[in-house]
């Protein structure tokens, strides 16, 4: 398709001529109106068809803003008039206008703070003197603190932190504030005396007590001696003899603990062992014998090695679960003579048994004995095969032993207690 450039140019020229012709009468009409206003007459606008051409035929883009442009001279005059209308600043005390930019507070400093940052202008210090170690302000040597933005004396200043000490103390106090929970726990732990905590509360020591009455780590009571079950009888005999030789003097004399009431258990002499011999599988572990040379109390109960060897070497489990269903409690209290206190060995005969004070069973003062039912293998079922172990009265028991305790109110004999009286057995697990 070919374009006719001449025809397009002719159309543009014709359109421009029409616009120019329409603008000429309009400007003439405005001039006539102005003249009429000066003379007091009113003029009317010309008719639309007076020019002979349509007035609305022009096509233009009304972008706006072009008519608001004014010459530079007029704009300058308007800005000058607005500046004159502003109120002037009040004069200072001396009648002169106040200085716009403050000077540095350091003596002899004439630095222009107008070129510095607003921080330095507000605090009246130049950038150089804000970091100087020593400056003279009002005749005194001071230093500018960058933390509180003030001048301080050298005595109040910390050179390492580049800050005043007063502000540093408050800052450290706020950051290192001690916690109340931590202080309470620390004071509680510090108040506890001793090397370790014990699950049982011990009584306080009294001045009237004999020395060594409390168990300590150096005491032979504190040492745990373990005897292997597979060891021979001779090695076990030597082991128990060594324990008897290590018995302290206050235990050999049969002294009681002062904090125990009358009628309670007291410690007795050391262990006296005898060589093993042929005996039933459930021979008693306690017997009544003559006191040894190292013993201080006569007629005390001693442990025998005969029944111990058979029990340790036995294949039967030392548990109540292996006991036969038809076995009953055995009363063995009639052949032991009555004593006020039932002495007891210092170390457990069978490993794992505890004769400690935490496991003792207290009894009233009227009770002087008890009945004890040891566990026997399944081959022994009768009551007649077990001799006496403890006191003649079977009312209560006051000794802790791994096995079974017999508590009843019978007449005191073995047959009488099983036939006439009502008895009950309390099982205790081996410890």
Curated annotation (Swiss-Prot):
It comes from the Eukaryota. Zn(2+) 1 binds at residues 104, 109, 126, 129. Residues 21-41 have a biased composition (Low complexity). GO terms for molecular function: DNA binding; zinc ion binding. Keywords: Metal-binding, Zinc, Zinc-finger. Strongly expressed in immature ears and weakly in husks. Found in the inflorescence meristem of the developing ear, in the spikelet pair primordia, the glume primordia, the cupule forming region and other floral organs. Not detected in other tissues. Residues 18-55, 68-102, 408-431 are annotated as: Disordered. One of its GO terms (cellular component) is nucleus. Residues 408-419 have a biased composition (Gly residues). Zn(2+) 2 binds at residues 145, 148, 152, 164. The N-terminal domain is necessary for dimerization. SBP transcriptional regulator probably involved in the domestication of maize. Acts as a transcriptional repressor binding to a 5'-GTAC-3' motif. May repress the growth of lateral branches in length and numbers. A single Lys to Asn substitution at position 6 is the probable cause of the transition from the hardened fruitcase surrounding the kernels in teosinte to the cob that bears naked grains in maize. This substitution is not affecting the DNA binding site specificity, but increases the stability of the homodimers. Monomer and homodimer. This is Teosinte glume architecture 1. It comes from Zea mays.
């Amino acid at each position: 398709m070919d374009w006719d450039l001449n025809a397009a140019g002719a159309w543009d020229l014709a359109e421009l001529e029409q616009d120019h012709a329409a603008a000429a009468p309009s400007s003439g009409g405005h001039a006539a109106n102005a003249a009429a206003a000066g003379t007091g007459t009113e003029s009317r606008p010309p008719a639309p068809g007076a020019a002979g051409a349509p007035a609305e035929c022009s096509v233009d883009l009304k972008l706006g803003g072009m008519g608001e442009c004014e010459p530079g001279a007029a704009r300058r005059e308007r800005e000058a008039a607005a500046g004159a209308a502003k109120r002037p600043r009040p004069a200072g005390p001396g009648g002169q206008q106040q200085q716009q930019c403050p000077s540095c507070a350091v003596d002899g400093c004439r630095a222009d703070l107008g070129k510095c940052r607003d921080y330095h202008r507000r605090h009246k210090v130049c950038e150089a003197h804000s970091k100087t170690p020593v400056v003279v302000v009002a005749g005194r040597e001071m230093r500018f603190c960058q933390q509180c933005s003030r001048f301080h004396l050298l005595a109040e200043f910390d050179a390492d932190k580049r800050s005043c000490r007063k502000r540093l103390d408050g800052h450290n106090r706020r950051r290192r504030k001690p916690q109340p929970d931590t202080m309470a726990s620390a004071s509680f732990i510090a108040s506890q005396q001793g090397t370790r905590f014990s699950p049982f509360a011990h009584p306080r020591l009294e001045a009237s007590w004999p020395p060594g009455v409390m168990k300590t780590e150096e005491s032979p009571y504190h040492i745990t001696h373990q005897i292997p079950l597979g060891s021979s009888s001779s090695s076990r005999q030597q082991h128990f003899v060594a324990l008897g030789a290590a018995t302290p003097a206050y235990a050999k004399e049969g002294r009681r603990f002062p904090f125990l009431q009358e009628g309670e258990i007291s410690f007795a002499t050391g262990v006296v062992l005898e060589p093993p011999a042929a005996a039933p599988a459930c021979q008693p572990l306690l017997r009544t014998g003559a006191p040894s040379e190292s013993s201080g109390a006569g007629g005390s109960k001693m442990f025998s090695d005969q029944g111990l060897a058979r029990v340790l070497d036995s294949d039967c489990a030392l548990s109540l679960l292996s006991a036969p269903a038809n076995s009953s409690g055995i009363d063995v209290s009639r052949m032991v003579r009555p004593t006020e206190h039932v002495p007891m060995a210092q170390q457990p005969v069978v490993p794992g048994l505890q004769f400690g004070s935490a496991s003792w069973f207290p009894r009233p003062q009227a009770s002087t004995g008890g009945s004890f039912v040891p566990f026997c293998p399944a081959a022994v079922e009768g009551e007649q095969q077990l001799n006496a172990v403890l006191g003649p009265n079977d009312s209560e028991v006051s000794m802790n032993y791994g096995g079974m305790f017999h508590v009843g109110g019978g007449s005191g004999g073995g047959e009488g207690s099983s036939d006439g009286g009502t008895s009950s057995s309390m099982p205790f697990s081996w410890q």
